[in-house]
Amino acid sequence: MDKSEKLALNVSGLLLVVFLVAIVYASVAKEVDVPTCITDMEPFATDTLFQTGPDSYELQMVARMWAFQPGNITLPAGSTVDLYLTSQDIIHGFKITGKNLNLMAVPGAINYMSVTFEEPGVYDFACHEFCGAAHHTMAGKFTIVEEEAFEGETFGEGSL
Amino acid sequence: MSTLDFRFTKSEKNLNSTLIIIPMVLLFIGIYGGFMQTLFRAGIVQSDPFMGGEYYKGLTIHGVLNAIVFTTFFAVALGNAVIPWSLKMNLNSKVAWLSGILMLVGSVITALVMVAGEATVLYTFYPPLKAHPLFYIGLVLVVVGSWVAFFNWIPMYLRWRKENAGEKTPIAVVGMFTTFIVWFIATLSVAVEILVFLLPWSLGLVDEVNVMLARTLFWFFGHPLVYFWLLPAYVMYYAFLPKIAGGRLYSDMAARLVFMLFIVFSVPVGTHHQYMDPAIGSQWKFLHGVFTFAVAFPSLITAFTIAASLEYAGRKRGGTGLFGWIKKLPFFEKDSWFFSYLIAGLVIFIFGGISGIVNASYQMNTVVHNTAWIPGHFHLTVAGPVLLAFLGGSMYLIHQFMGKPVKMKGWTLSVPYIYTIGVFIFSWGMMRGGLIGMPRRTNTGASYANPESMLYQPDWMPFIDISVIGGSIMFLAIVIYIVAFFATVSARSEATLEAVTFPVTAPLHDEPANWLRNFKPYIYIAIVLIVLSYTPVILDVLESTTGGSLPYSPNSPVPLR
Amino acid sequence: MEKEDKDLEGFSPKGAVAFFLIMITVYVVMWFSLYFELIGRG
């Protein structure tokens, strides 16, 4: 190994270490993390949404061929949602556009991630794992309204 | 290095030609499917004359034929070529043909089942979507065939080591063995997935399958698979490119180190495809992320070593200044047409590399997972450097083994450059679309890209259209290649048939590197890392999943039994 | 093209080092642009 090779080796190692440090920082300081193993939750087959605190909700969502239940959720701005996701048939994928929430829905397992909606607006989600013939129609949305205009959380069927 | 005393037998030549030509036909079917998918996604077509209106059937064919069938055949053919040539030993012809026939039969079965619409499960075949049992059997035959090829080389290598004690194993042989050591370890997992779980379940012998477990076994195989694609390209970069460019490999030791690191770190990384999965602890996902960074390291070293080797070649050709040597490289020399396939792939891989590091970066995967970014990324890797190196390699092997002159040299030489323009446009569209939420594996033309649909997403349209432009250019390049390839295959044999040869030259810096001369310690380290990284993952999956899944068809939300 | 067996005297890959450092810089810029996208999404 000559000098230039050693330089390339060191720079490569340094690059990867810098990336790793940034990842750990985002995880620890910014609390942006990946889903982990959930063992303290009973399996569920129906969807529910209920308030757990002044600005917090728990949503149990079921993915199936070819709809999310619920597919249409209305909440006030500033809400934090503890989202539990499972599938009742095959594998589906769930990602909220513009948010750090991206989950696989796998039958026999429960996935979990928390998300906070600060800004009012419409947040779409679309199934992103191939789930059969009508996969491309499996979608839904969160509608986040101003706190003053909010008339109680709603959730329902349908993608729109 | 004299090779005059070694000749391939007629049987070896015929076998290797077959292993190149038949998969080339399958590759083209798959690539046609890929081109149609860009049109489907944009809503330009709803049906095509050959494959019909089933987008996901076409996508399955595209993935399986291009990423699994074509790549495996080429890797075996390259091994069948460079290992005997480098060791100056003929193959056991019977075993080699057995391997080839197993792979051919398996590929044809798999292809027919897919075309019949009995296996629309994509190339990842995640349960509980169920394919026809013959789909799994066909894949098993392809894999077993590739193992037989590998087992055929092992005694040759051991004999050579005995007869040439103290000599360094030729780098091409090291590279091919690395490829197949990684492949063998990885395919053990998918063999368990198929033979223990999916096949009995598909046949109806058992009712249910644990989906998370099958998925985890798949990705144990699925990520090392990408190194199985990449490593034969690395063999050509390290062993052939320096000579083709007119120089020497800068450092022999760096090449050997790179291959050994691939053996160590290729496998304990699969969970980075499952960052967004349930039932796996995030600490284990992080561990797999760290190992993935470790396996990025040999590729970074490769970037430097190859650049240094090319600089040496460029300076020998009279290049001066910091970057003047680049201009002297044989980009457009017809007799060095192979150069364009390797250099264009390397340029593409600069961007394939960083987008891959992004994917592997733990929670950053949230932004890109299962979005169109992912196919954008892997068309810069497997459909970039890997495809181009394999196409160039296929042309070279045919030229050598059939003794045919390369036809349409100007066009042949241009293919990689046209393709590079296309793939950059395509991937840019896909990746940008992915960042604003466009999903992968989705027939957007029927919903999100259809102005009449309630789901219409106008923001995605520019990026979908860009991917059509890029995809069309890529397809054009491949059509040119296929014409040139078959023109070469059907050309008249060269008058003076010379012995098969490969562009290999001695390295510039040839250090002893005694610690890099034996695979064994690296295989042992790899096994330890695999056990450490996968035991907790499998335990998590088993402990936190409930029940199994009945099989489903893609066409109905009601289970098949 | 010169004869193959004649090696260059005192070759040092300055251009390759420069290329490599540029590539790493590009990598840092691309990676962190995605990283800040992630942090910004919340």
Task: State the predicted function of each range.
Chain A
Residues 92, 138-141:
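Extracytoplasmic/periplasmic beta-strand context in beta-sandwich domains
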Residues 95-120, 149-160:
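Extracytoplasmic beta-sandwich strand-turn segments characteristic of Greek-key/jelly-roll folds
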Residues 142-146:
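Interdomain boundary/hinge segments at the C-termini of tandem beta-sandwich modules
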Residues 43-90, 94, 111-119:
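Beta-strand cores of secreted/periplasmic/IMS beta-sandwich domains, seen most often
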Residues 128-136:
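Short, exposed beta-strand-loop hairpins at the edges of beta-sheets
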Residues 1-67, 150-160:
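Extracytoplasmic entry segments of secretory-pathway proteins
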Residues 75-77, 105-107, 134:
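A generic structural micro-feature
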